[in-house]
Each structure stands twice: as structure tokens, then as C-alpha cells.
């Protein structure tokens, strides 16, 4: 889906759900990170996170567009357009728009892999796993008091 198709989708949803035209611009903004979309108060444009389409498809985009159009139409009419406003919450229920979008952040793999040190006793082969490297000259086996050696 590109910006032109998104613009047509927003205009169609606006007419079907609100019976009012959407006369401004709707486009994808790849810089959005944690939000599905946003309504810009000064320009009246709507920005949509392209990651929402990639992860969840057209159904999620339609929900985000409905939500942002609630902000849009209430702001244009001079009514309460913020999330905390009663008029906004009522309009969300009326058009069956979601209050929140699905989670967009994918869990990143841990950057720093936890390092483990494995020691073994020379006499009885008792294993010791430690996060912090230790001086084998200073410590001995707790079972037989034998010498320790680093495996990894």
C-alpha cells in the first residue's frame, strides 16, 4: 500500500463512517515508532505508521484510520478531540473505532549476551558456573578442596 491508496482509503472510511469528507492529506510516516498514527492539529493531516500495515495488515490500518478520523472530525467541528474528552470517547464507540492499536514494537534480541564462566574441580569434577570471572589461585573446590580450572 502506498500513500495514494492510503489517501483513498481514508477518504472512503470518512464518508462511510462519518458521512463527512476528509479534505486534507493522509500519508505514511516511517519515523513513527510506538504509535499507530497521529492527527496533526495545525495541518489537519493524518500520519500512519507503515509498520502497522506490515505487521497486521489492512484491518489494523482501518482501525487506526477510524481512530485518527475521530480526532480529525471533532477538531474541525471545535469539539473535544483529545483522548480524555467525553465527546471523543462517545464517537469512538459510535463508529466502533479502537481506543488503542496493536503493539508495534517487536522485541529486539538482547544486545549484550550474558557471559558465563564455567569452572571445574581437577579432583572431583564438580562444576561451578559464574557470571563474574574469578581468580582460580585464590579459590578452591567446596566439596574436596581441590584446585579449580576454567573450562570456557
UniProtKB/Swiss-Prot annotation:
The active site is at 68. Residues 6-151 form the SprT-like domain. Binds 1 zinc ion. It holds the Pfam family SprT-like. One of its GO terms (cellular component) is cytoplasm. Disulfide bonds: none annotated. InterPro entries: SprT-like_domain (IPR006640), Uncharacterised_SprT-like (IPR023524). GO terms for biological process: response to stress. It is found in: Cytoplasm. Zn(2+) binds at residues 67, 71. Its cofactor is Zn(2+). Keywords: Cytoplasm, Metal-binding, Zinc. GO terms for molecular function: zinc ion binding. The keyword Protease does not apply. Belongs to the SprT family. NCBIfam families: PRK04351.1. This is Protein SprT-like. The lineage of its organism: Bacteria, Bacillati, Bacillota, Bacilli, Bacillales.
Amino acid at each position: 500500500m502506498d500513500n495514494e491508496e492510503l489517501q483513498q482509503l481514508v477518504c472512503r472510511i470518512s464518508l462511510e463512517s462519518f458521512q463527512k469528507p476528509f479534505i486534507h492529506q493522509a500519508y505514511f510516516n516511517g519515523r513513527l515508532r510506538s504509535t499507530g498514527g497521529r492527527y496533526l492539529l495545525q495541518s489537519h493531516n493524518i500520519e500512519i505508521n507503515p509498520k502497522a500495515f506490515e505487521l497486521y495488515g489492512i484491518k489494523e490500518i482501518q482501525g487506526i484510520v477510524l481512530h485518527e478520523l475521530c480526532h480529525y472530525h471533532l477538531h474541525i467541528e471545535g469539539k473535544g478531540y483529545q483522548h480524555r474528552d467525553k465527546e471523543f470517547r462517545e464517537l469512538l464507540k459510535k463508529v466502533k473505532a479502537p481506543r488503542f492499536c496493536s503493539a508495534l514494537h517487536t522485541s529486539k534480541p538482547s544486545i549484550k549476551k550474558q557471559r558465563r564462566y564455567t569452572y571445574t574441580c581437577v579432583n572431583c569434577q564438580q562444576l561451578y558456573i559464574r557470571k563474574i570471572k574469578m581468580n582460580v589461585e585464590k579459590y578452591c573446590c567446596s566439596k574436596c578442596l581441590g584446585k579449580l580450572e576454567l573450562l570456557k
